[in-house]
Amino acid sequence: MELGVPLPRRPVPGSYGVPFVSAVRDRLDFYYLQGQDKYFESRAERYGSTVVRINVPPGPFMARDPRVVALLDAKSFPVLFDVAKVEKRDVFTGTFMPSTSLTGGYRVCAYLDPSEPNHAKIKQLLLSLLVSRKDAFVPVFRSNFGALLDTVESQLASGGGKSDFTALNDATSFEFIGEAYFGVRPSASSSLGTGGPTKAALWLLWQLAPLTTLGLPMIIEDPLLHTLPLPPFLISSDYKALYAYFAAAASQALDAAEGLGLSREEACHNLLFATVFNSYGGFKLLLPQILSRVAQAGEKLHERLAAEIRSAVADAGGNVTLAALEKMELTRSVVWEALRLDPPVRFQYGRAKADLEIESHDASFAIKKGEMLFGYQPCATRDPRVFGATAREFVGDRFVGEEGRKLLQYVYWSNGRETENPSVDNKQCPGKNLVVLVGRLLLVELFLRYDTFTAEAGKKVVITGVTKASTSAVNRTA
């Protein structure tokens, strides 16, 4: 479409099919018969549009109404970030909402629209916590993940020749987040001990089961996970144990919450949710994905990363500092590229606050007030109209240089553009900058130790070999 030429206006194509029956059939396509990417791509192809009416899971009986207008390109997708146009009340998980029994009876911040009074208070609490703990992130990460890599080396040397990074990361990320945010390792808590990651994973599953597949046979898994909610009482003891840790470890943050006008109880449930669901749930997915992508990219990228990382650390006197990290342009680009291809949260939702117009690359569409808008992020962030012929490929240096940085506005993983920042007035992830920092720190730890490494990627990421660094540019600290 030429610049300045109005886009043709079209009705939104697509079909919701026969009530109930089509929604169930579409759910089976989504999880078992087609898979997520093919589910959306096939419907965009069928109707010749990247804005299309479809059903989304979980459907009956979990969701009252599975009908959405799907936004499947980089141009239409960002309307979901505009809280002047879309309402974000109770749409964090989409067309269904988990029971508030799983969050202490509270609608936590993720489910609040910015227009609701407590949204600003809770988000300010989260933003302030991150600022207050900023000096802890680098040393605490290095301590925890340095120990993880020690374990990797031990397991590789033990004769098996493999080390399950995914499993190690599940345990290490939980320890790291608790210590980084609150100064107290969860494993030191009498309520959790070493069982924290398991309790957290169960609590996450109880909320995300309708959007999850565990690899069980369809005839068993679909009615078990996608039809009716899992009973909250089955994990109430696990949640109480998690809550007890936060009530004790986060005492300073809870004091600050009272100063913002929040009760300690509501603040504690929100800190638990933000830490376990948002941060831990995100790192469980993201860090293995970064490792997998970099392993598959091969030795040439490894050489470039090692050279950049070691040079920046050497210039900082052998220390890993925030200033040194800012000099690592390729390292940061690799993290952004992993987030572009494999966003930890793939779905975004919003309900139209009024009649509005949405534009794709090719047409304009009228949306009625109250319609549910849905974005499948991988379609948007792999849009070939923006990222060209390599849109589906991992290109580590994609965001290097002035031209590369222009593409950052199309990186949406944080529920906002990468060029924007979270505030109390929007729904962008409060930990946006921390996530990119942690991704870089993982690469720094890897390439200060190793010249290269190999890994197998499937449902788990398994490290199969490491080549120790031939030179060292860092004075490693505990």
Swiss-Prot record:
GO terms for molecular function: allene oxide synthase activity; heme binding; iron ion binding; monooxygenase activity; oxidoreductase activity, acting on paired donors, with incorporation or reduction of molecular oxygen. It is an enzyme of class 4 (lyase). Weakly expressed in roots, shoots, leaves and flowers. Pathway: Lipid metabolism; oxylipin biosynthesis. Keywords: Fatty acid biosynthesis, Fatty acid metabolism, Heme, Iron, Lipid biosynthesis, Lipid metabolism, Lyase, Metal-binding, Oxylipin biosynthesis. Induction: By jasmonic acid, salicylic acid, hydrogen peroxide, copper and by the protein phosphatases cantharidin, endothall and okadaic acid in light-grown seedling leaves. By incompatible rice blast fungus M.grisea. Not induced by red (R) light or abrasion in dark-grown seedlings. (13S)-hydroperoxy-(9Z,11E,15Z)-octadecatrienoate binds at N278. Its EC number is 4.2.1.92. Its cofactor is heme b. Gene3D superfamilies: Cytochrome P450. GO terms for biological process: fatty acid biosynthetic process; oxylipin biosynthetic process. Belongs to the cytochrome P450 family. This is Allene oxide synthase 2.
